[in-house]
Structure formats: structure tokens, C-alpha cells
Regions:
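N-terminal beta1-alpha1 ligand-phosphate binding loop
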Residues: 2-25
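Anionic-ligand binding patches
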Residues: 2-7, 46-203
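Cofactor-binding loop segments of dinucleotide-utilizing enzymes, especially the Rossmann-like FAD-
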Residues: 12, 32, 122
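Surface-exposed, flexible loop/turn segments at secondary-structure boundaries
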Residues: 15, 35-37, 125
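A short beta-strand-loop structural module common to alpha/beta enzyme folds
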Residues: 27-38
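N-terminal beta-loop-helix "entrance" segment that forms/cooperates
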Residues: 38-48
Length: 203
């Protein structure tokens, strides 16, 4: 049997790490060193009407290419997620004050999460997949928001929506439409199918 290709996850996301680990994939972690905000701003300048799903895919591609160039013999898995509300693209909050602002803007509103995953080898992206989910936060009280921020802590700043749906953040929601893994940040079923096709997992 041929030796399986070494797999690298180009992400420092604990959630993505845990999803792949739970699925039985052997891999190492090498977070991509790219300036995401600079890329986002450049994309916005080039095309004000760019689709948020396309932004997620382009960022996932950039991460995959960056790590693959430094690890040409490995199979790289990279991902990105964007959040859009009425045409506005959100970034991860820098602190709890920004997290509060994000949640107040999303409160009672329907928004979209767009999650992209890319596979790269030898410096080139060879496969991508993008999925979207539609979510709506309930019209929670300020008292609940204050309590949530206190209990959830700085960890929510790792989520573009300032919520972690797999934890306490689930209580923020009124409606969720979409794949659970996509919402967490990695479309697992399409990714696992592609890894099996490539021989990185047993078919």
C-alpha cells in the first residue's frame, strides 16, 4: 500500500482542529501567515459588489497556497468563513466591545455565513468547496447580552459573528438553516469525500 500523503491543516482554529480530529484524520497544524484584512480591503476596492462567498473562497485559496508553497510535499487543507448582513461584510471582533457591537447589529436580523474549504498541493489549489447557511438571532435583551459576554468571554472573538454556536452562543438564535459543520467553519462531508477520493482517507 502506498504511503499516504502528509496532511496539514492551515488554520489555528481550535474548532476546525477538533472536527478533523474527531473524524479520524491524521494531520498537523500550520496556521497560514497571511494578512486577511489587507486581502479583504483589496477585494472590496477591486469590486464593491463582490459576493461574500467569493471572499471566503479567495481567502481559503490564499491560505492554502501560502502553506503549500512552504510544504510542497504535503496536502494542505485551508478554510475561511465570512458573515454578511444586508450587503455588509463582518470581520472577527478584536475584543469584547466589538463583539457587543456585532451582536447588537445582528440581533433580530437574518444573516448569512459563507464557509469555504480549499485543498492545495505544490503551491496550487486543486479543489475548493463553498457552502452557505442562513441564521437569525433572536431579539435578546441587553441584560442577556451583558450576561452572555461575561460568561462566554474572549473566546467568542475567534468567531466572526461573536458567537460560538457549539457552546453558550446557541441560546442567541431563533432560527438556523444550514449544515452544522458549515456553521462551525468547515464543510466536513464534502471535504471528507474529497479526501477519500485522493486516498488520504480509507474509501
Amino acid at each position: 500500500m502506498a504511503e499516504r500523503q502528509h496532511v496539514i491543516l492551515a488554520s489555528g482554529s481550535h474548532t476546525r482542529h477538533e472536527m478533523l480530529k474527531a473524524a479520524g484524520l491524521a494531520f498537523t497544524v500550520v496556521p497560514a501567515d497571511i494578512d486577511e484584512e489587507a486581502i479583504r480591503k483589496a477585494l472590496a476596492l477591486e469590486n464593491e459588489a463582490i459576493d461574500p462567498a467569493d471572499v471566503a473562497e479567495l481567502l481559503a485559496r490564499a491560505k492554502g497556497e501560502a502553506v503549500s508553497e512552504a510544504n510542497p510535499g504535503s496536502l494542505i487543507i485551508a478554510a475561511d468563513q465570512t458573515l454578511s448582513l444586508n450587503g455588509h461584510l463582518f470581520s472577527k471582533p478584536a475584543d469584547l466591545d466589538q463583539a457587543r457591537e456585532t451582536l447588537l447589529r445582528l440581533r433580530g436580523e437574518q444573516h448569512f455565513l459563507h464557509t469555504a474549504v480549499a485543498i492545495a498541493e505544490h503551491g496550487d489549489v486543486t479543489w475548493t468547496h463553498v457552502e452557505s447557511a442562513r441564521l437569525k438571532l433572536r431579539n435578546f435583551s441587553m441584560a442577556y447580552l451583558n450576561d452572555y459576554l461575561l460568561r462566554a468571554g474572549e473566546g467568542i472573538c475567534q468567531s466572526v459573528g461573536a458567537y460560538q454556536i457549539e457552546k453558550l452562543g446557541l441560546q442567541l438564535f431563533e432560527e438556523i438553516n444550514g449544515d452544522y459543520f458549515t456553521i462551525l467553519g468547515l464543510p466536513m462531508l464534502p471535504l471528507l469525500a474529497e479526501l477519500r477520493r485522493r486516498g488520504a482517507l480509507t474509501d
